[in-house]
């Protein structure tokens, strides 16, 4: 009996030891898993941040076609823009146009502004221009010019006479004729409206004439 009780005690001790080992292994696995999860989440966030920053500040941003034209119009505004810049220093080396740069390399705001057209002379510069740039016209020149324009207009009118006849009566003349016809119709209607309803006869009736004749006799 004592041997059996010892065996039971030993088996129970071994079971307790196994339970203790299992609980210890679980307790050690939990913090390890939590640390791994934290590291994994941190690595994912860092990767997303680097990708976003690379997209925001990447140097390979390109613009082509209609997008390039729209952005140039937006940046330059009323000044206008050129597709290529010409520097007067050296004409041997041709400059690349904005299409070659922005479509195949990279494009930014500073580069776009270099292709904007420079504003021309101001109004003050135009007003201070010498008056001898446009010589004044004399009266004789004006007369000749006016006479020439008149004769040329007359020639054109003569040339177009055939076309005018083919076209028929002009619209203005047709409108005038229509207006005259309408006026005549209105006058006729007014005359009819002012006419009396009953007209008195000029001659006497026959009965009255016969009655008046014996009285005279």
From Swiss-Prot:
Residues 97-117 are annotated as: A. Keywords: Developmental protein, Differentiation, Disulfide bond, Growth factor, Neurogenesis, Secreted, Signal. Pfam families: IGF2_C, Insulin. CDD domains: IlGF (cd04368). Its main location: secreted. Residues 84-96 are annotated as: C. PROSITE patterns: INSULIN (PS00262). It comes from the Eukaryota. One of its GO terms (biological process) is positive regulation of transcription by RNA polymerase II. Belongs to the insulin family. This is Insulin-like growth factor 2.S. The gene is igf2.S.
């Amino acid at each position: 009996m004592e041997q059996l009780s010892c065996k039971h005690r030993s088996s129970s001790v071994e079971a307790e030891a196994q339970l203790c080992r299992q609980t210890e292994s679980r307790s050690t696995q939990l913090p390890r898993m939590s640390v791994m999860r934290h590291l994994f989440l941190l690595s994912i966030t860092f990767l997303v941040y680097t990708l976003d920053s690379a997209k925001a500040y990447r140097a390979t941003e390109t613009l082509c076609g209609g997008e390039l034209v729209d952005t140039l119009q937006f940046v330059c505004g009323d000044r206008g823009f050129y597709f290529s810049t010409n520097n007067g220093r050296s004409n041997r080396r041709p400059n690349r146009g904005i299409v070659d740069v922005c479509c195949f390399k990279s494009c930014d705001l500073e580069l776009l502004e270099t292709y904007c057209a420079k504003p021309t002379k101001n109004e003050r510069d135009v007003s201070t221009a010498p008056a001898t740039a446009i010589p004044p016209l004399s009266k004789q020149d004006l007369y000749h010019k006016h006479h020439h324009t008149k004769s040329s207009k007359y020639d054109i009118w003569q040339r177009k006479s055939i076309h005018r006849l083919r076209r028929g009566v002009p619209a203005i003349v047709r409108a005038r004729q229509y207006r005259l016809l309408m006026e005549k119709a209105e006058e006729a209607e007014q005359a009819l409206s002012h006419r009396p309803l009953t007209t008195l006869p000029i001659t006497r009736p026959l009965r009255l004439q016969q009655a008046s004749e014996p009285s005279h006799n």
